[in-house]
Amino acid sequence: NKWTSATAYIAKRKSIDVIAFRGTESGLDVLTDINVIPVPYAGRLCHGGFVLQHASIWQQILEHLDPRKRTLFTGHSLGGALAELSAAKTWKQHKNINLVCWGKPNCFFKGFKQPMDLDYQISCVNGSDEVARRPRLLYGPSSSQTMLYFANNGTNVVDPGKLFRKVDRGGLKDRITDHKMAGYTERLEQYLEERKVAAKKVTDLRKKDKDDLETIADELEAS
């Protein structure tokens, strides 16, 4: 949208449509981020600036939604907030809605953070990323989200407690640099590689257990 600078990209596949929202980029986007007045939207109170951006392109996005297919809403920073608002607008009418956000700011007014029944709802947070912690006074994340936290010590934690995140938090420089998408990409690749290695270990253990059982069976049969 040329007035709000809101931008979305749509990739259509055979069984899933991916709708990705662009994050903060222009001066208008910054004004959006600081407009924290709550307004009613999607059956709850939401961050007014995010709602303004989302509403400016939502009708265009609706034209591309196919209820017969899975839909993944995703985005980084401001784009993550717009993706979350999209899920809030559609989950009651459409099945198979999925949400993955990166460094997403809080957009639901506290007290109006009703859970959403999505296929999956993941919010990725990279270490000290300050944007993913704000605005804090009036707003919070959806109560049904799963947080994948890329800790500063190199570990990956699912739904860490507030104390853990507070202790893990770095200095001012880290709070800025950890918000960059490049950092998220690096940590995601690391996480997926660790999952791949872990899956191989499980497969190897199962194969070893099977081989051990077959050896025992052969010995019993021969005795």
Predicted regions, residues:
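Non-catalytic, mobile gating and regulatory segments of ester bond hydrolases
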Residues: N1-T74, L78-S223
